[in-house]
Amino acid sequence: MSASSVSRKQLILEIRGKAKISCDLKRHLSPRTVGTIMRSLPLEGHAHLLGKSILYFESNINSGIERSKTEFKKGDVAFLPSAGSLCFFLNDTVFTKTMTLIGKLSENIDALK
């Protein structure tokens, strides 16, 4: 059963053969970006690690910056418009590029490491 609502959409992030992690996209954080991502589902791609703090994968989503941030907490989900990438934060991080916060991983975050 999904706990989704108009302002929050619960998704499953699946790392093939490794883990399934619940992810909440929150429309109130960045309405335009979350709406664009929701219309683009399902998404598939190859995951890449950036240092020890960020797991990301590139997509074909085209959305500008919205409510930009450079500081993120463990479990945050953000969109990097310059690369069209979805980013999952494995640790608290200050990043050099601005991103749009779009949601939160709700469980089993360490399975991404």
Segments predicted by a language model, with ranges:
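N-terminal intrinsically disordered, low-complexity, charge/repeat-rich segments that act as generic
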Residues: M1-L29, G45
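Glycine-rich active-site loops that engage anionic ligands at enzyme catalytic sites
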Residues: C23-K113
